[in-house]
Amino acid sequence: MMTGGDTGRLPSKGIGIVGYGQSKYAKHTDRTLLSLLAEAARAAMDKAELTKSALDGIAVCSFDLPPDNAVTLAEQFGMSVSWAYLGTAGGAGPVASVINAIRAIEAGHASVVLCLAGDAYDVAGHYRMMDNFNRALRNYGAPNGFGGANGLFGIIQRKHMETYGTRRDQLGRIAVGQRASATLNENALFRSPLTLEEYLNARLIADPIRLYDCVMPCSGAEAVVVAPLDRAPSGRGVRVLAGYERHNHPVGEIAPLRGGWELFREALYRDAGYGPPEMDFVQAYDDYPIMVAIQLEDLGFCPKGEVGRFLAMHSFSFDGSLPLNTNGGQLSCGQAGAGGGMIGLVEAVCQLRHEAGPRQVKGGRRGLVSGYGMVGYGHGLSASCVILERGAA
């Protein structure tokens, strides 16, 4: 698939991620969103060895934040900023926020940017959010019995299975492999091992999607600090080699088996100087295993329609042949609203700093992080991706 040219190319590889942090995840909590975001922000600044006074930019992605926004969050954090960004791309927004923070720094609008993502709600809060997600869903989906993302992705998975012969036992290898990594992650909501038999026999949710295809809505927050790499603690900066975003592709297609990644993947790998074989891990947006599979196809890890065979050939735990969502991903950690779009980014930085402890990918040098979001009437509207590389020791 040809790309749309150089549109979106990052201007510099001298800017990257110098710190990362995560709040405690919880299925139920009485904590406020502000406290969760603050916990993640403090952790990220500690990792960056920076104080609040060094920050002059802020980016935030959250469904639960309105009527507050990035500017009011800066006020609540006691920050004076020259650049503020409010993400609007759902699960693709956090990766896009880092891309735009790099552009802002390169343009001189900021020097150090705190990027945040998270939400504070349970299952009931998740459904309240979906009721007001966008006008298309409210006006056209809900009156016709559309009950949210499970129904749409059930259609997409069925379509993929019937079009290409993809099987549930192949898709299940994603959930099982990620759960194996989650058993070593103290912040994952689900840490018990998951067998393929348990995956296949779980209760039906939206045919053919079953229980372990779905994420658990939860509360939590993630943060990264974006800055010139010479601001990073010695040897612990993470380069952003390339990054792209795309919105509303394919135009007008209902339940598509592709997304915006296919339009920019050639430019992504060209800019990075590396392709899929050189990725030591992949942190893919995993609201459902079928979407991970589609991302692997669209990002060129296997030809379109052959992901079932690809999945059958690989193992996906942190020590597998293709380490995938090495903290367990949203399928095991939970989906903290918009934080689900940053959980993979934070894990990637952790891996590249070789700070992942027992789930460390051996010799991890570079990896890919993708985002996907704004699932409304017929398809997700937004796709994003970055390629990261470990800094010099």
Language-model features, listed with the residues they occupy:
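Extended C-terminal subregions enriched in glycine
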Residues: 266-289, 298-301, 330-336
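Conserved catalytic cysteine-centered active-site region
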Residues: 9-11, 62-116, 120-152, 190-214, ...
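Short glycine/threonine-rich loop-to-helix capping motif typified by GTGT followed
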Residues: 65-74, 252-256, 286-309, 320, ...
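Condensing-enzyme catalytic core mediating Claisen C-C bond formation in acyl metabolism
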Residues: 2-34, 163, 173, 204-267, ...
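Beta-strand segments within the central parallel beta-sheet cores of soluble alpha/beta enzyme folds
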Residues: 52-61, 84-86, 113-118, 169-176, ...
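Conserved active-site "lid/cap" helical segment
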Residues: 2-92, 100, 160-170, 189-198, ...
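Active-site-proximal alpha-helical scaffold in enzymes
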Residues: 89-119, 151-184, 224-230, 335-356
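Acidic, glycine-rich active-site loops and adjacent beta-strand->loop/helix elements
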Residues: 22-24, 62-65, 90-93, 117-122, ...
